[in-house]
């Protein structure tokens, strides 16, 4: 058995921290875990993605068409993940847009959100989209977006990690003074999404 997660967004959204929490939780549950990360630009706003693979896997790169779950912190980055998605993939999408630097100077406009979601729905098994930034702000801080997205992922059918293991990994990897906000964000994300 294997399970593949593709996490994508832009620098500064907490993609790598989220992936580290997932990876540690999987190891704590006794799973074989491999992870890779790609930084587009080494600054806020550059594309960032990670690939996390659990179980009977040999390499850290998810083969085309084999991602079981895509956690997209930014809608356009979700579109870029299309080749990684399996036909049955669950896609979690934060609808808050952060246009990439190369699009700002491009003659091509940022696609309408409705078109992005429609394209994802045509290519994946399940798509759940919501304004994660709004939920993070309501939880106490916009920088808790990554925990909103983690909570949403944990609510999906087939997600292989338990809530308690994820929370323990959060406690090991996040500042204690922000734990209350991050836990609230995690639970709000969990309640927002249910891919069944």
From Swiss-Prot:
GO terms for molecular function: indolepyruvate ferredoxin oxidoreductase activity. Keywords: Oxidoreductase. It catalyses: indole-3-pyruvate + 2 oxidized [2Fe-2S]-[ferredoxin] + CoA = (indol-3-yl)acetyl-CoA + 2 reduced [2Fe-2S]-[ferredoxin] + CO2 + H(+). InterPro entries: Indolepyruvate_Fd_OxRdtase_bsu (IPR017719), IorB_Oxidoreductase (IPR052198), Pyrv/ketoisovalerate_OxRed_cat (IPR019752), Pyrv_flavodox_OxRed_cen (IPR002869). It comes from the Archaea. Catalyzes the ferredoxin-dependent oxidative decarboxylation of arylpyruvates. SUPFAM superfamilies: Pyruvate-ferredoxin oxidoreductase, PFOR, domain III. Its EC number is 1.2.7.8. Heterodimer of the IorA and IorB subunits. Disulfide bonds: none annotated. Optimum pH is 10.0. The keyword Flavoprotein does not apply. NCBIfam families: IOR_beta, PRK06853.1-3. Optimum temperature is 80 degrees Celsius. This is Indolepyruvate oxidoreductase subunit IorB.
């Amino acid at each position: 058995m294997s399970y593949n997660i593709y996490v994508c967004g832009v620098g500064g959204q907490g993609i790598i921290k989220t992936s580290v929490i997932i990876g540690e939780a999987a190891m704590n549950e006794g799973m074989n875990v491999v992870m890779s990360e790609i930084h587009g630009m080494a600054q806020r706003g550059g594309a960032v993605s990670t690939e996390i693979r659990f179980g009977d896997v040999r390499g850290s790169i998810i083969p085309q068409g084999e991602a079981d779950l895509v956690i997209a912190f930014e809608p356009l980055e979700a579109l870029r993940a299309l080749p990684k998605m399996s036909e049955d993939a669950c896609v979690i999408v934060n609808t808050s847009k952060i246009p990439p630097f190369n699009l700002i100077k491009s003659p091509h406009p940022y696609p309408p959100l409705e078109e992005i979601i429609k394209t994802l729905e045509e290519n994946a098994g399940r798509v759940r989209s919501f304004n994660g930034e709004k939920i993070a702000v309501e939880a106490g801080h916009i920088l808790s977006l990554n925990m909103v997205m983690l909570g949403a992922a944990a609510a999906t059918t087939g997600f292989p990690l338990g809530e308690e293991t994820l929370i323990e990994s959060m406690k090991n990897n996040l500042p204690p003074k922000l734990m209350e906000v991050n836990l609230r964000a995690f639970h709000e994300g969990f309640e927002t999404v249910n891919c069944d």
